[in-house]
Amino acid sequence: MSETTSWQPSASVANLLKRASIIAAIRRFFTDRGVLEVETPAMSQATVTDIFLYPFQTRFVGPGAADGMTMYLMTSPEYHMKRLLAAGSGPIFQLCRSFRNEESGRHHNPEFTMLEWYRPHYDMYRLMNEVDDLLQQVLDCESAEMLSYQQAFLRHLELDPLSVDKAQLREAAEKLGLGDIACREDDRDSLVQMLFTFGVEPHIGRDKPAFVYHFPATQASLAEISSEDHRVAERFEVYFKGIELANGFRELTDADEQRQRFEQDNRKRAARDLPQQPIDENLLAALKHGLPECAGVALGVDRLIMLALNAEKLSDVIAFSVERA
């Protein structure tokens, strides 16, 4: 055995005890509100098409699958949970393992714990208030600041993300030391996202959580487009102390529109020489059957616990980080 091998957990036993207490409190939060806890598969025959997500892939070989069946570890339980909603589950939540074949570091681990929940008949604002309630309970923090994506951009970059052109975006990127990257990027939306990541995120949610809502419609993902302003989507994200904690939507219910978005993602993947991903036909069938009007959110539990315990890094609050797995 290598002398550098460490069998010990990355988190202290004291932190693991505190972690267990926080997870128990999260469960109470939802059971007290009549939200059903569910479990869904960790693997699927389909996966996300989002160009910024990298799923793990494996092969299932068993009876009737002599040549093997490609399976994907879930980056989120979203698709399966929406199928439950379409089947009439009512409000549901899940605490589960999710997997993303991406970086490992202070705020990232390729295997992580996700809290995801869905509220039929909630709009985006009502769900944001419930997320705020949960954060105040777990983090003992102040009520969050609420600002639109447009307001955040104007405040910190003095640019309107809904109307700014690519030349102005590249000029702003140059001021942030990102000129070399920006000059090679021709997609306007990617430039907007880059400026938000490096020019806005570091400045919000420092003293209390910040909810940023009404993302550009080009970043709608699985969210509805706002009926009041078609330039924006009913999507929000939550930030606190430099960490992205949660991502929520008023959920898209139109199966045809969702298929178009998946296909558009795959076209973007092809343009970037990324593998095109299999579209989840089961999800689309559920949407066609009828997904109730609802809002949903995914929250990173390890990051939440890291903040609650004032830990320096994720490995301080998970039993075994990927380096010790």
Curated annotation (Swiss-Prot):
GO terms for biological process: lysyl-tRNA aminoacylation. The keyword Ligase applies. Keywords: ATP-binding, Ligase, Nucleotide-binding. Gene3D superfamilies: Bira Bifunctional Protein, Domain 2. GO terms for molecular function: acid-ammonia (or amide) ligase activity; ATP binding; lysine-tRNA ligase activity; tRNA binding. GO terms for cellular component: cytosol. Substrate binds at S76, P77, E78, Y118, E251. ATP binds at R100, N101, E102, N109, E244, L245, G300. InterPro entries: Aa-tRNA-synt_II (IPR004364), aa-tRNA-synth_II (IPR006195), aa-tRNA-synth_II/BPL/LPL (IPR045864), EpmA (IPR004525), Lys-tRNA-synth_II_C (IPR018149). It catalyses: D-beta-lysine + L-lysyl-[protein] + ATP = N(6)-((3R)-3,6-diaminohexanoyl)-L-lysyl-[protein] + AMP + diphosphate + H(+). Pfam families: tRNA-synt_2. Homodimer. Belongs to the class-II aminoacyl-tRNA synthetase family. EpmA subfamily. NCBIfam families: genX, PRK09350.1. With EpmB is involved in the beta-lysylation step of the post-translational modification of translation elongation factor P (EF-P). Catalyzes the ATP-dependent activation of (R)-beta-lysine produced by EpmB, forming a lysyl-adenylate, from which the beta-lysyl moiety is then transferred to the epsilon-amino group of a conserved specific lysine residue in EF-P. This is Elongation factor P--(R)-beta-lysine ligase. The gene is epmA.
